[in-house]
Amino acid sequence: MTGWQGERQKVEWGEIERRLETRLPADFKEICEVFGRGAFCGYLELLPVDSAGPRSLLGRWTAMKERWANPRMRARFEPYQVFEQSGLILWGQSVTEASYYWLADASASPETWPIVARTDPLEELHRFDVSTSEFICRVLTDRDFRPFSVASKVKSLYFEPYG
């Protein structure tokens, strides 16, 4: 789809999944290994999975858990909660502050987890019963996938690696 031919990344999924206490969707893992750090069409970024730094998938999940006691924080995500056996796990974002989560459930197959997303931290959350890869594809290519589509702004599909 993007013509990307970079070197495949090695990711320690066992450690990430051990800390989360759940497996992650196979298509997300495949995308991370094939593309590594970067952005699709200069817009949609997957959170880094090669570290536990504050901007990584694990770092953002940890920070969200730590702030969850704040009632204003919880109100911004109602009716959902941060993942602890079930709940939201942030996996991606856009350069315009859109946020992409799984509505994860450790007792269910990760391939069945819906996507919950919003275009802005103060906007409403939208639920999509699609895989991670389908969600990414629709954001980039489906002009009718509102309010998340950037298809009308993207002339060709590409992946821009970071660092």
Model-derived features: where do they sit?
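A generic structural signal for short, non-catalytic loop/turn and secondary-structure boundary residues
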Residues: F83-E84, A108-P110
